[in-house]
């Protein structure tokens, strides 16, 4: 997991790499787009904006082929992050959606969520899973970018 407090800090750290430069462009564009409509830049990423409630899940979610990048637009976003190896599988991985779901082992405590500030950026690694701490009716918008794990 990598957390940047602002898009400017993200740009300073990663904009020298083409796919991350495009990720920054996608985040900037997604703040002006209609909700729930996916777009792409090149062949390495897709992006869209959704209400935070659409990301809420009672399970941890992890991916194998894409980094998930989250950037809250209107309200801070609380995200629980754990290594997949510290979780128990809660169903089969779907190659179609590139999604695996996980649960806490032995009813462990959730711990403290990572809070992504408005305009901040959270990058999830393929070895991690996340659970968004939001209710299904949360309306704050979040930019979601899926970036291929190939290359860096």
Q: How should these model regions be labeled?
A:
Residues 1-50, 59-62:
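A short, N-terminal "cap"/entry segment at the start of jelly-roll beta-barrel domains
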Residues 44, 65-69, 119:
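Short, surface-exposed beta-edge/turn micro-motifs
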Residues 62-63, 136-138:
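Short glycine/proline-enriched turns and hinge-like loops at secondary-structure junctions
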Residues 64-79, 83-86, 92-105, 147-148:
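Short, conserved beta-strand element in jelly-roll/cupin
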Residues 69, 121, 137-152:
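A short hydrophobic beta-strand segment most commonly corresponding to one strand
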Residues 105-111:
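Short alpha-helix capping/helix-loop boundary micro-motifs
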Residues 113-135:
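Conserved metal-binding segment of the jelly-roll/cupin
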